[in-house]
Amino acid sequence: MFLPFTAALALLFASGSALHDDPLTQPIPGNPDWMKPQSPLKLYGDTYFVGTGGISMVLIDTGDGLILIDAALPQTVAMTEASIRQLGFRVEDIRYILNTEAHYDHSGGLAALARESGAEVITSSIGAAALRAGRADAHDPQASSLPEQPPVPDARGIADGHVVRLGDTAVTAVFTPGHTPGSVSWTWKACEGEACVDVVFASSLNAVASGSFAYTAHPEVTAALRASIDRVEALPCDLLISAHPDNSGGDVKIAALQAGATPNPFLDRSACRAYAERARGRLQARLDREAS
C-alpha cells in the first residue's frame, strides 16, 4: 500500500533544509498555480500524469525503464519525485527526460531531475542549446523577461521526427516552433490490452511575447507558429496532454478522471483540433491588437 500523496509530500519536505540549500532547486518566482500540488494519476495504459496543478508532466512506463516528459520548475522537483514514487515507480529508473520547451516553467527542474535519475535530457537542437546555457534563446519572443534557470550541460539536441525508443515504446519528436524557437511536441501509442490510442503531448502554442517583441514585426515567427498549429491539428490524436493543462481543458479532465468519470474524459479525438483552433484564435487576436 502506498502513502496518500499529501502524506508522501509531508515526509519528503520534512528535511526541507536540504532542498533549500540545493542550487538546482532554488525557487524561481512564477504563477502560484504552477506550484499547486496535484495527485498523480493514470491517464491510459502505461501513461501517467505526474505534473502540478498548472504544468503538465507525463511518465511513461516502457517495460524497460521510464520516460519523463518535461520537468516543471526547480522548486517542484520534490513534488515530481513524490508523484513518481506514489505511483510505485523509482526516480532512478528514468532513462530519458524529454522537453517541450526551454522555458523555466517546463524545464527549470530538468537539471535536478537529471542528476537524481541519471537520465539523458533530449529536445530539439535549438532547445538543447538554451538548456545548456541556462537561458532562453535570444530569438525567443519572451527572451527579455525570462529568468535564468539551472543549466543542463549534457542536454542532447535531436532532429525533427527523431524516435526515442525504450522497451516497447517509441516516442516521436514533432517540432512545433513559434512559442519558442525550439519547441517540440511528442507523440506515442499507449495501450490497454489490444486497445491502443495515439497520445500527443503538445507544446505550448500561445502567441505570448514580452518587451518590444511584436509578431507583426517578425513574420517568420508568425509563420512558424501558424505551421506548428496546423501540424498539431493534423496529428493522429486520441488523447491530448497540453503543456499547461488548462489550455486544453486538461484541468477539468484530470478532476473528472480522479472522480472516477467514465468513459475516460481524456479520450477525445477532437482534442488536438480544439487545441489548435484555440491557439489560432489567440494568435489572430494578438496580431489584431498589434496592428491596431
Write out the residue ranges for each language-model feature.
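Metallo-beta-lactamase
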Residues: H20-P29, K36-Q38, K42-Y44, D93, ...
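Active-site neighborhood of phospho(di)ester-bond hydrolases with catalytic His/Asp-centered motifs
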Residues: I69-A71, I94-H103, I122-S124, T176-G178, ...
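Active-site HxH/HxHxD metal-binding segment of metal-dependent hydrolases
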Residues: Q75-A78, R85-V163, C191, L267-D268
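Loop/turn elements at helix/coil->beta-strand transitions in domains of secreted/extracellular proteins
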Residues: G65, E92-R95, S117-E120, T169-V171, ...
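Sec-dependent signal peptide recognition
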Residues: M1-A8
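Active-site environment of divalent metal-dependent phosphoester hydrolases
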Residues: T76, A102-G108, A128-L131, P181-V184, ...
